[in-house]
Design a protein with these regions (language model features):
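Histidine-acidic metal/acid-base catalytic patches
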Residues: 1-20, 24-117
Length: 117
């Protein structure tokens, strides 16, 4: 049994809000869609983050504009909203692929709005 599963079974959802980080989860080898399905109603906060193969450094993946990577961010956001209990969306991006952080903020916000959030 994984530590995450032990935590999820042990934490009282009426006392603790779980924030699922869909990008870091992918980077760690898990699939956010599967986790949302396994624990419906448990993820009030969703860390919306997409990943691509890293261009260098020690990491295998780096963050990118949501919807442009390999995480299936839109499908995860939609499912988390539908069955995961998600009400708060926190967009995160630490790598910018030649853009400025503000350009990425604007693009990520535009995409979330296009998705209906």
């Amino acid at each position: 049994e994984k530590l995450f599963d032990i935590m999820m079974k042990s934490i009282n959802p009426e006392l603790v809000v779980i924030q699922l980080d869909i990008g870091n989860m992918y980077n760690g080898g898990a699939v956010a869609m599967d986790v949302v399905k396994q624990y419906p109603g448990r993820f009030e906060n969703l860390h919306v983050k997409d990943e691509i193969l890293a261009s260098g450094g020690n990491e295998k993946y780096e963050s990118t504009i949501i919807g442009k990577g390999i995480v299936n961010a839109r499908e995860v956001v939609d499912l988390a909203t539908k069955i995961g209990g998600t009400k708060v969306y926190i967009i995160e991006q630490e790598s910018y692929q030649g853009k400025t952080p503000m350009e990425c903020v604007e693009e990520n916000l535009r995409i979330m709005k296009e998705w209906g959030y």
